[in-house]
Amino acid sequence: MAERVQSHTPGPNKLPARYLQFQKRYPKVFQAYDALGAATAEAGPLTDKTRALVKLAIAMGGEMEGAVHSHTRRALEAGCSPEEIYHVALLGTTTLGFPTTMKIFSWMDDVLAQKE
């Protein structure tokens, strides 16, 4: 069984300003969103690391830069290594295409370079 999820949202010092503004402006919506994230995480057998990598892959497929940044940070927090994170991007090459994969690597580097 998967580990129990404490919160869907990372610490406040890691959140983008836009996210914090949304949280402040729409607290009830934010609470519902946070609860939905926790409920979906707890609904199945995936581990924290596996969930983090799956969510990263979903963000990659949507070509969402902010989400790739966020889920790269979350993958690190879940205990994933940079090599595991880069492997997810590499696996997307044949599905997303080489130019998209290069773009995703640059987004991951935005986060991973700060950790070095």
PLM feature spans:
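Acidic, glycine/proline-rich low-complexity segments that act as flexible tails and inter-domain linkers
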Residues: M1-T50, K103-E116
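Residues at alpha-helix boundaries and short interhelical turns
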Residues: Q23, T40, G44, G61-E65, ...
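Short alpha-helical scaffolding segments that buttress acidic/His motifs in well-ordered protein cores
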Residues: Y33, G37, L53-M60, V88-T93
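Short polybasic/polar patches that bind polyanions
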Residues: E42, L76, T94
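Short connector loops at helix/strand junctions that flank enzyme active sites
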Residues: K49-L53, S70
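Mid-chain, well-packed structural core segment of small domains
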Residues: M60-A89
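C-terminal structural segments of small proteins and small subunits
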Residues: Y86-D109
